[in-house]
């Protein structure tokens, strides 16, 4: 089971967190601080797996971001590396070569994509095409809702101007 997902920049700034196990807010801050320090200080040639508090942390660096997932000891690290890569590929497909700024300004989309991949710390959808189709449908629904809200606002504005 994946206990949490953490995206951290090279500067140590948290860009995304998703918790699948209960942690108090104080504990979350401590975990983020601790893991950021451990992962950011590791050399690029070292293994992408870290033993930590009875768990394993699997991480991978893409550009200026570290994608980290905390898993149980008995879980397969290579599978989790593939899940991380899968997530990055979907982000790349959606944003067109994703960068840190995409995640900063469109964090809600990054969370939505992650929620399509993982539920309760387990892989839900392995098909990139299916996830892309679902995200596209969601984007279309948002556009329709914006158009309807805009037309309702126009009707209200016209009614109040009379």
Curated annotation (Swiss-Prot):
Membrane topology (UniProt): Peripheral membrane protein
Superkingdom of origin: Eukaryota
Pfam families xref list: Clat_adaptor_s (PF01217)
Source organism per UniProt: Arabidopsis thaliana (Mouse-ear cress)
Gene Ontology terms: cellular component: AP-1 adaptor complex
Tissue specificity remark: Expressed in roots, stems, leaves, flowers and siliques (developing fruits and seeds).
Location within or outside the cell: Golgi apparatus; Cytoplasmic vesicle, Clathrin-coated vesicle membrane
Function (record text): Subunit of clathrin-associated adaptor protein complex 1 that plays a role in protein sorting at the trans-Golgi network and early endosomes (TGN/EE). The AP complexes mediate the recruitment of clathrin to membranes and the recognition of sorting signals within the cytosolic tails of transmembrane cargo molecules.
Keyword check for Manganese: no
Biological processes per GO annotation: intracellular protein transport
InterPro entries (alphabetical): AP1_sigma, AP_complex_ssu, AP_mu_sigma_su, Clathrin_sm-chain_CS, Longin-like_dom_sf
Taxonomic classification: Eukaryota, Viridiplantae, Streptophyta, Embryophyta, Tracheophyta
CDD domains: AP1_sigma (cd14831)
Assembly: Adaptor protein complex 1 (AP-1) is a heterotetramer composed of two large adaptins (gamma-type subunit and beta-type subunit), a medium adaptin (mu-type subunit) and a small adaptin (sigma-type subunit).
Name of the protein: AP-1 complex subunit sigma-2
PANTHER family in the record: ADAPTOR COMPLEXES SMALL SUBUNIT FAMILY (PTHR11753)
GO MF: clathrin adaptor activity
Keyword Electron transport annotated: no
Classification via SUPFAM superfamilies: SNARE-like
Family under the similarity heading: Belongs to the adaptor complexes small subunit family.
Annotated keywords: Cytoplasmic vesicle, Golgi apparatus, Membrane, Protein transport, Transport
